[in-house]
Curated annotation (Swiss-Prot):
GO MF assignments: magnesium ion binding; manganese ion binding; phosphopentomutase activity
Positions annotated to bind Mn(2+) 2: 301, 306, 354
Cofactor note: Binds 2 manganese ions.
GO biological process: 2-deoxyribose 1-phosphate catabolic process; 5-phosphoribose 1-diphosphate biosynthetic process; metabolic compound salvage; nucleotide metabolic process
Gene3D superfamilies, per the entry: Alkaline Phosphatase, subunit A (3.40.720.10), Phosphopentomutase (3.30.70.1250)
Gene that this sequence comes from: deoB
PANTHER family linked: PHOSPHOPENTOMUTASE
Cofactor(s) the record lists: Mn(2+)
Enzyme Commission number(s): 5.4.2.7
Function: Isomerase that catalyzes the conversion of deoxy-ribose 1-phosphate (dRib-1-P) and ribose 1-phosphate (Rib-1-P) to deoxy-ribose 5-phosphate (dRib-5-P) and ribose 5-phosphate (Rib-5-P), respectively.
SUPFAM superfamilies: Alkaline phosphatase-like, DeoB insert domain-like
Biological classification of the source: Bacteria, Pseudomonadati, Pseudomonadota, Gammaproteobacteria, Aeromonadales
Entry similarity comment: Belongs to the phosphopentomutase family.
Name this polypeptide is given: Phosphopentomutase
């Protein structure tokens, strides 16, 4: 029986990529800078980063290969039990869809559309079309913004007027924040569908519904009912090939949204690290032969990376690490565990955006030979390795190391 379990540690980069200069990210290192800050005693209430299980899988060694420096505080004198390395991104952007699609064998070699202006970000003709087609009383925002700050700035006015909050970032995204109770969740989703259609000429990667609750400035909180409306991947991914071969592909968290529901046979919802881990373990127990279980642990990115919360990111990493033994106990002889990321989001870096970084490539299980797999020239080596292991058609990009 062959099964693959992919744990996507969203935004967990391990060192500035070779082309980081094109993105203003030279020197970024999500893992390295978190580890350094913890080891130096710079984070109140924290000591050195403690990741014993990830270290056994080769995380520290992968970090050293990627950046030239072993992550401070991690155990270097450890017997590594998995295959470890790092991968450079071929895709043109440092965004979520590009990273996920490339990992599954489909790099994004075209340029996404972006809204570059920080104020009055969206074209007026687009805004007018949205107002008309959705029957809106108007809109708020129309700017680059932090997803939490924009709620404090505009949340009360949104509740009072019924005008949705429209904002973007350095990514190829159009984000819409609305109050779940005063505006309505389904109404927000309907608005996102309308915007997704209107954005077709602009080549924007995602429309993101950002529902929130709360009564006023200072206590607004985003809920777990986020929904991403992605464009379709431009070619079949390893997930499509598994589904077409009669296998199962289980999406946990936002995976199905990122792949626009393509190649998915079962969707499982989950919010927060604890619930995502619980759902993952449940699906591992239930998985049959020729199954991929794919979980996105989004909190690393959304709650800690973008918010530049070093302590929160470090604590979340340690919690994630503490759950790994539960997964290991469930593994059977034909199982492969993959731990990786889709981009970086260094919480010590300036701004609030993603960082262009190498990603960790960690494979573990009885079919996997322990040791370094070195530098991988594309994230697609991960998908190609999974395809080869399961006897699926060869992907157009990537080289298997299994």
């Amino acid at each position: 029986m062959k099964r693959t379990f992919i744990l996507m540690m969203d935004s967990f980069g391990i060192g500035a990529a070779a082309d980081a200069d094109k993105f203003g990210d030279v020197g970024a290192n999500t893992l390295g800078h978190i580890a350094k800050a913890c080891a130096a005693g710079e984070i109140e209430g924290r000591g050195a980063l403690n990741l014993p299980n990830l270290s056994k899988l080769g995380l520290g060694h992968a970090g050293e290969l990627a950046s030239g420096t072993f992550p401070a505080g991690l155990n270097k004198d450890i017997d590594v039990v998995g295959a470890y390395g790092f991968a450079q991104e071929l895709s043109s952007g440092k965004d979520t869809p590009s990273g996920h699609w490339e990992i599954a064998g489909v790099p994004v070699l075209f340029e996404w559309g972006y809204f570059h202006d920080h104020h009055n970000s969206f074209p007026q003709e687009l805004l007018d079309a949205i107002v008309e087609k959705a029957g809106l009383p108007g809109y708020l925002g129309n700017c680059h913004a932090s997803g939490t700050q924009v709620l404090d700035d505009l949340g009360e006015e949104h509740m009072r007027t019924g005008k949705p909050i429209l904002y973007t970032s350095a990514d190829s995204v159009f984000q819409i924040a609305c109050h779940e109770e005063t505006y309505g969740l389904e109404k927000l989703y309907e608005l996102c569908h309308i915007v997704r259609e209107l954005l077709e000429p602009y080549n924007i990667g995602r429309v993101i519904a950002r529902p929130f609750v709360g009564s006023g400035k200072g206590n607004f909180k985003r809920t777990g009912n986020r929904h991403d409306y992605s464009v379709l991947p431009p070619a079949p991914t390893v997930l499509d090939y598994m589904k077409e071969a009669g296998g199962q592909v289980v999406s946990i968290g936002k995976i199905a949204d990122i792949y626009a529901q393509q190649g998915i046979t079962k969707q499982v919802k989950g919010t927060g690290l604890t619930e995502l881990w619980d759902r993952t373990l449940e699906e591992v127990k239930a998985a049959g032969d020729q199954t991929i279980v794919f979980t996105n642990f989004v909190d690393f990115d959304s709650s800690y990376g973008h918010r530049r919360d070093v302590k929160g990111y470090a604590d979340a990493l340690e919690y994630f690490d503490s759950r790994l033994p539960e997964l290991f106990e469930l593994l059977e002889d034909g199982d492969v565990v993959v731990l990786t990321a889709d981009h970086g989001c260094d919480p010590t870096w300036g701004g609030t955006d993603h960082t262009r970084e190498y990603i960790p490539v960690l494979f573990y299980g009885k079919p996997v030979k322990a040791g370094s797999v070195g530098r991988r020239e594309t994230f697609a080596d991960i998908g190609q390795s999974i395809a080869a292991y399961h006897g699926l058609p060869k992907l157009a990009y990537g080289t298997s190391f299994l």
